[in-house]
Amino acid sequence: MANPFVHVELNTTDVNKAKNFYSKLFTWKLEDMQSEMGFTYTMISVGEGTGGGMLKQMMPGAPSIWLPYVGVDDIEAATKKAKSLGATIMKDVTEVAGFGWLSIIVDPTGAHLGLWKPKK
């Protein structure tokens, strides 16, 4: 795998305001779904190209941010490799029921990046 960007996620302080803005700015299809963890996740379908999602920012006081995800073949190995290269693991490998696995790293410069392994 060439490790493409496969998903982008908006963690926002105001989901309704963000949905209103982006649905008017772009021709995105927004679809709410309930996560197994009890929060609403809005899927963003863009037609061709990389889609994404949005959810309520869960870190108190944190600003709204866009978080890109890169596809990997082995999420455990990629997360460990990132750590060995100086990254901080913000969220260790976690299963997203029915979809795949993710981890979130902070690179040595302070930039956040998600790693994603889809279920086959």
Label each PLM-derived region with a short phrase.
Residues 5-7, 54, 64-69, 113:
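Short, structured motif recognition centered on aromatic/hydrophobic residues
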Residues 48-53, 109-113:
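Short, charged/polar, Gly/Pro-enriched secondary-structure boundary elements
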Residues 2, 9-49, 84:
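Core segments of cupin and vicinal oxygen chelate
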Residues 31, 61, 76:
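Ligand-binding pocket scaffold of soluble enzyme catalytic domains
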Residues 3-4, 10, 31-34, 43, ...:
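Vicinal oxygen chelate
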Residues 41, 55-56:
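Intrinsic, low-complexity N-terminal interaction/targeting segments
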Residues 18, 76-81:
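Short amphipathic alpha-helices within nucleic acid-binding modules
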